[in-house]
Amino acid sequence: MAIYKYSNKVEAVWENADHCSCGSNDCHPNSHRECGICHETIFYGSHETVQNQRNSRGAWNLDHIKPISRGGSNQTKNLQAVHIFCNRSKGNRY
């Protein structure tokens, strides 16, 4: 598994995300999590900042649970790890 180092905020949000329920014997505990929106698998090494990963199946980024435009904050408690396409689909909804 490749080693990635993200910002402290990204790492904190990843750690707070629900663990995947894939049941795979080769599922490393820190390599998968569940998308906060659709609850499908996201992959640690597929964060949007990793080159060539933005369009991968498990690509993810940070979503503001309550959008900034609706009074939300950039605090970790208002952020969740989600698929990039789920984040785009959610848009400004809360």
What kind of feature is each model-predicted range?
Residues 12, 84-85:
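Residue-level signal for well-ordered alpha-helical scaffold segments within enzymatic catalytic domains
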Residues 41-44, 85-89:
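Cys/His-rich metal-chelating microdomains
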Residues 33, 88-93:
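Basic side chains
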